């Protein structure tokens, strides 16, 4: 017993039109003779088309369900149900999605194509120092790129020569070939898909409308740029082919590590060495800042090693903003290794008078334990 139309498409009798179409497209792609070498592909493909031709039509489907498979076919053979044997799917409606997937892209437009091709984007890695990132800077860079031909002005044709429309494809850039139910498009062999013919190509660019050379360009790096920032320079990439638009240039910023500062977003961190005397007594010391020069930093009396002191608005600038980050100083208390006789005497006297240096009472051990908390 032969399969009925529902079985051929692999759907139930209650399948919706959307389910029918989905099943049909899947099977049509699988069994189309151009996509498989299976011996029975052509036969299966005809069965699939015949089944879908009936089931996609609500009136035919109702008759098919009422009469059954064999009776419906007998009626069709007597001419009672129309001529579905010559069924030709609407290529734009039924197979639009199929062609998009199977042919690797969307269907081509019937409008003439342009021979102009946009140029490629370029990437340039630029390394700057932290001060340059803070202030902003103009940098001159050099790179190899395709540039618009100054002889033919990008047309690809010798000066005074005209570009003619391809007579093989009428300027479309593609030719069509009918294969059964399908219309296949391919690039025109005469114009290579350009849509026009350059009879006398420019000798300097060999008809491409561009050639390669070393370029020099001044690029602006804004103040507050961060490591890893990508800056786009529109139209500074490679020139297009035969007058097409130029691509873009992307400058990727790398900031070199600094000898003093570590960057944390807009904040700067630095280690600040101070004497144990300044740590104990407090005072003011000068510290360098990223914009140049120095500022005074107040050291509170009793400052401990590892304490962090903040200088507000002395960090990095922010792009397109007047707000700055902070500078955070991490205190490193230095203990002198070489003492003069007088310094030693004073420290010995301080030691005797200190009541917090008694190592035998409980307070010393409590301090030791607190260092772990």
Curated annotation (Swiss-Prot):
UniProt keyword Nuclease, yes or no: no
InterPro entries: DnaJ (IPR012724), DnaJ_C (IPR002939), DnaJ_domain (IPR001623), DnaJ_domain_CS (IPR018253), HSP40/DnaJ_pept-bd (IPR008971), HSP_DnaJ_Cys-rich_dom (IPR001305), HSP_DnaJ_Cys-rich_dom_sf (IPR036410), J_dom_sf (IPR036869)
Coiled-coil intervals: none
Primary localization: cytoplasm
Localization terms from the record: Cytoplasm
Keywords, ordered alphabetically: Chaperone, Cytoplasm, DNA replication, Metal-binding, Repeat, Stress response, Zinc, Zinc-finger
Residue sites binding Zn(2+) 1 per the record: 149, 152, 202, 205
Gene3D superfamilies listed in its UniProt record: DnaJ domain, Heat shock protein DnaJ, cysteine-rich domain, Urease metallochaperone UreE, N-terminal domain
Cofactor list: Zn(2+)
Pfam families: DnaJ, DnaJ_C, DnaJ_CXXCXGXG
Domain J, residue spans: 4-68
PANTHER family in the cross-refs: DNAJ HOMOLOG 1, MITOCHONDRIAL-RELATED
Record family assignment: Belongs to the DnaJ family.
UniProt-recorded name of the protein: Chaperone protein DnaJ
């Amino acid at each position: 017993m032969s399969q009925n139309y529902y079985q051929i498409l692999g759907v139930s009798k209650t399948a919706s039109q959307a389910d029918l179409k989905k099943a049909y497209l899947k099977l049509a792609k699988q069994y189309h003779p151009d996509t498989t070498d299976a011996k029975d592909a052509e036969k299966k493909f005809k069965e699939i088309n015949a089944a879908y031709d009936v089931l996609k039509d609500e009136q035919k489907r109702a008759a098919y369900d009422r009469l059954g498979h064999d009776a419906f076919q007998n009626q069709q053979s007597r001419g009672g149900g129309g001529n579905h044997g010559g069924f030709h799917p609407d290529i734009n409606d039924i197979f639009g999605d199929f062609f998009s997937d199977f042919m690797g892209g969307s269907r081509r437009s019937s409008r003439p194509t342009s021979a102009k091709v946009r140029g490629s984007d370029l990437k340039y890695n630029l390394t700057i120092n932290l001060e340059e990132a803070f202030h902003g800077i103009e940098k001159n860079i050099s790179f190899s790129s395709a540039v618009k031909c100054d002889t033919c002005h990008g047309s690809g044709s010798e000066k005074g020569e005209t570009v003619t429309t391809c007579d093989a494809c009428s300027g479309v850039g593609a030719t069509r070939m009918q294969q059964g139910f399908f219309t296949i498009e391919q690039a025109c062999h005469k114009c290579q898909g350009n849509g026009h013919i350059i009879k006398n190509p420019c000798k300097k660019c060999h008809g491409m409308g561009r050639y390669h050379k070393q370029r020099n360009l001044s690029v602006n790096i804004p103040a507050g740029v961060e490591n890893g920032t990508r800056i786009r320079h529109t139209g500074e990439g490679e020139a297009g082919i035969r007058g097409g638009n130029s691509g873009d240039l992307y400058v990727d910023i790398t900031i070199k590590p600094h000898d003093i500062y570590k960057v944390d977003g807009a904040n700067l961190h630095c280690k600040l060495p101070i004497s144990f005397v300044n740590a104990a007594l407090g005072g003011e010391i000068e510290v360098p800042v990223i914009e140049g020069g120095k500022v005074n930093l107040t050291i509170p009396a009793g400052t401990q090693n590892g304490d962090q002191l903040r200088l507000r608005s002395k960090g990095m600038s922010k792009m397109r903003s007047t707000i700055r980050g902070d500078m955070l100083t991490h205190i490193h208390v230095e203990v002198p290794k070489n003492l003069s006789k007088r310094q030693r005497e004073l420290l010995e006297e301080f030691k005797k008078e200190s009541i917090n240096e008694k190592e035998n009472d409980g307070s010393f051990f409590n301090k030791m334990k607190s260092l772990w908390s």
